[in-house]
Design a protein with these regions (language model features):
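Conserved SAM-binding strand-loop segment of SAM-dependent methyltransferases
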Residues: 89-98
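Conserved SAM-binding motif I beta-strand of class I
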Residues: 68-73
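A short acidic, Gly/Pro-enriched loop at the edge of an enzyme's catalytic core
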Residues: 100-111, 115
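Conserved SAM-binding loop of SAM-dependent methyltransferases across substrates and taxa
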Residues: 54-66
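Conserved SAM-binding loop
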Residues: 82-83
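Conserved class I S-adenosyl-L-methionine
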Residues: 43-53
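C-terminal substrate-binding/active-site "lid" region of AdoMet-derived donor-dependent transferases
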Residues: 77-78, 104, 119-184
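Class I SAM-dependent methyltransferase Rossmann-like catalytic core
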Residues: 1-45
Length: 184
């Protein structure tokens, strides 16, 4: 069964996949989401966010005063919460579906990828390059307590962010996170 078909349980502090009992997103990720939003929104231009989760990064992106904010979400339960969240935001465009199979015509000044249960991550580098403006900022969920470049971007730098994760099976990170920073 694909992730989009799984039943999710929501609380203020996390989303749990009820089929696997794995945390999809947790509120302790807020410092990571804040720094990610600051990075991809430096130009205040057009931003693409792939994966809404609890909306933590989305709120930080909105606080940056960006021109436009496109959010792609595949899971119907999260999409329902996303549509409710976006209903009073004129600069937000919600797209339902799998980011890797959608036809995007726009280019973006900032791109953030934070998906769960995604079998298409091998396509992210080519996708990002094709959808980025010159000089676009890109970052993605790392899930490692080390510098990690699974998408084989030519040049990646990292910011080390202090975190205090709750005990979980979501990640092995304990004290810090390396936020990847790519400029295309």
């Amino acid at each position: 069964m694909a992730f989009k078909d799984n039943i999710l349980e929501f609380s203020d502090s996390k989303i749990v996949d009820q089929d696997t009992m794995v945390e999809v997103m947790m509120s302790w990720e807020a410092p990571i989401m804040e720094k990610s939003a600051e990075y991809i929104c430096e130009s205040k231009g057009n931003i693409l966010e792939i994966g809404f989760g609890l909306g933590i990064c989305s709120n930080y992106i909105q606080s940056q005063g960006v021109n436009s904010h496109t959010i792609v979400e595949i899971h119907p339960q999260i999409l329902e919460k996303l549509n409710e969240w976006a209903s009073d935001k004129d600069n937000v465009n919600v797209i339902e579906g799998d980011w890797s199979s959608l036809d995007f015509s726009d280019k973006y000044d900032g791109i953030f990828l934070d998906t769960f249960g995604d079998d298409n991550l091998d396509k992210f580098k080519d996708f990002a390059v094709s959808r980025a403006t010159s000089g676009a900022k890109v970052t993605y969920w790392n899930n490692k307590e080390e510098e990690y470049n699974p998408y084989l971007f030519d040049s990646v730098s990292y910011d080390k962010i202090s975190i205090t994760p709750d005990l979980n099976i979501y990640t092995e990170m304990k004290d810090f996170y390396y936020m990847p920073k790519v400029v295309l």
